[in-house]
């Protein structure tokens, strides 16, 4: 029985945030004592109507963050260019917008300090939804709606860590289906 192969695999702890080689990560933020001075990499902010999913047709404020821990070849989001804005500046842009529902998107919004966003924005009456690739566990009690859009067909070795949510977004690439 000496020629029997040992199929055992040593399990290793996975990092909290998995990063693909070509990923564009936002810079680390310095610690701040005032939440309103927390800085976020903002690609764009705009008011629009949610166009997909359960909340399609709902008036929403979209905050698109820079940086992503994946590098999906089909992604058309320019998340590698952003403007650093304080939370105070972000609120100033949102205040005149006619709704209180925020959709956090990206890039990968779970790379940001979501707890700080929740501490400041929820008492102001905002609800927070997120569109995430699911590779980062989200803080509990901060988000009102979670849409997980896994990319495991492109990154089969990247673990989906956010295994609960309100909505699953499945994106099928025709090149993978081979019709």
Located regions from the model:
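Conserved Radical SAM active-site core
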Residues: 27, 35-36, 40-47, 59-66, ...
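Glycine-rich S-adenosyl-L-methionine
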Residues: 163, 170-175
